[in-house]
Amino acid sequence: MVKLVVGIGNPGRQYVWTRHNIGFLLLDSLASRFLGAFREAPRLYASFAKVEISSEAVVLMKPTTYVNLTGKAVLAAKKFFDVSMEDILVVADDINREFGFVRFRQDCGSGGHNGIKNTTQILQSNHYWQLRLGVGRPSYPGAEGVADYVLSSFSLNEKEKLNDFLEKGIEEILPWLGC
């Protein structure tokens, strides 16, 4: 049995430290902790690392599609690794929660997150797990403001707290991973 953990984010150096890429950042931390190294898998539209956690095979995946097209990569990996819906976890930013908030649950909606919407649409189900990481909401109104906000870098204050925040997210999912 294999578990699939998908971080939502955008490919490219310019997005590495943005709020929208917090899913990638958590996977980088998880891979480092369990000695995994990411490698490209163009057929899966992603880079991935295979790790073993408590004798369980876990695939960590960072799609190379953009956030709004995440579902294509999740479906390709689901088929390739023969993963059940219950063994899929998607890690995403959440602008509806303050920075530092962590929520882990199954069978839930998108909360307006386009990557989650696309994943649910492509999988034709929301029966997968989500780890939502609060990144806060912009202080300026409008959809354009939201897009600019999630594509902007963390504030200095947030950067100082980021490692602890990522660790909090990892601790939340370790029981699901078998630890």
Curated annotation (Swiss-Prot):
The keyword Hydrolase applies. It is found in: Cytoplasm. TRNA binds at Y15, Y66, N68, N114. GO terms for biological process: protein quality control for misfolded or incompletely synthesized proteins; rescue of stalled ribosome. It catalyses: an N-acyl-L-alpha-aminoacyl-tRNA + H2O = an N-acyl-L-amino acid + a tRNA + H(+). Its EC number is 3.1.1.29. The record marks D93 as: Stabilizes the basic form of H active site to accept a proton. Its main location: cytoplasm. CDD domains: PTH (cd00462). Keywords: Cytoplasm, Hydrolase, RNA-binding, tRNA-binding. The record marks N10 as: Discriminates between blocked and unblocked aminoacyl-tRNA. The active site is at H20 (proton acceptor). InterPro entries: Pept_tRNA_hydro, Pept_tRNA_hydro_CS, Pept_tRNA_hydro_sf. NCBIfam families: pth. Belongs to the PTH family. Hydrolyzes ribosome-free peptidyl-tRNAs (with 1 or more amino acids incorporated), which drop off the ribosome during protein synthesis, or as a result of ribosome stalling. Catalyzes the release of premature peptidyl moieties from peptidyl-tRNA molecules trapped in stalled 50S ribosomal subunits, and thus maintains levels of free tRNAs and 50S ribosomes. Monomer. This is Peptidyl-tRNA hydrolase. It comes from Chlamydia trachomatis serovar D (strain ATCC VR-885 / DSM 19411 / UW-3/Cx).
